[in-house]
Amino acid sequence: VSEYAGNFNDVIWEGTRDTWVAVGAAGSIFTAVGVKSDAYFSRFSNTVQDLNSVVYAQNEFVAVGNGGAVIASNDGNIWSPKQSNTNYNLNDIIYDGNRFITVGDNGTIGVSSDKNYWQPWSQQQYNNAVHPATFDFRNLKYIDGIYIGISTTGNLYYSFDLINWNSRVVSHPNSIKDLVATNFGPSQGRRVIAVGSGTTAFYADPVINRATATASVTAGVITSVTINDGGFGYDVGSSPPVIVAPDKT
């Protein structure tokens, strides 16, 4: 049983490995085998930086932390450092189905297809951004094709490309700490639940946040698009991409 007295910042359960992995202060990593296990064992992480988040994908555990720390392990027991190409604190890491994405302070975003080589996405793409991330990331989520960032001050932002970020105002005074997509709710069995300070808890159903628009067509060509309701995805006045399917006979 662990006698660790420090802080854990993240913990995950990986069913295919039947393993718990917890990460925390000063490079602390503890693992346990079995979903009901109460015996956690310390592992050498190869870093003294605080570890803030851990994810499992591509048959690997990957953890990130302060000072740009990135470490990886295929079993949770033996960890090796990776080069993140940043010195900013990394506060969260996700896998969006195609690549690892880590986010942190000063709008830092890093991407990797294999967890070994990390591309400093935010710095490299900055010149192409109309609304770059200028906030400190606390968390990053990927839900229904949308990247959702939560800042360290509890504000909500969204992006389709990790380059341009827009603020999403919510009608709640307390800061948001985290959110999760669930498989229940009135709209196609989906509901996003957010939690935050002061026992904050609220939810959104995708149908409420769906953008609607009216297109003008001349001689079979779309000449303009008017946003009627920006929903979650667009600000009124922005120019969203339009995909037109061929006519069906």
Segment roles from a protein language model:
Residues 207-249:
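Conserved, function-critical positions that sit in or immediately flank catalytic
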Residues 1-207:
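Residue-level hotspots at or immediately adjacent to binding/recognition sites across diverse folds
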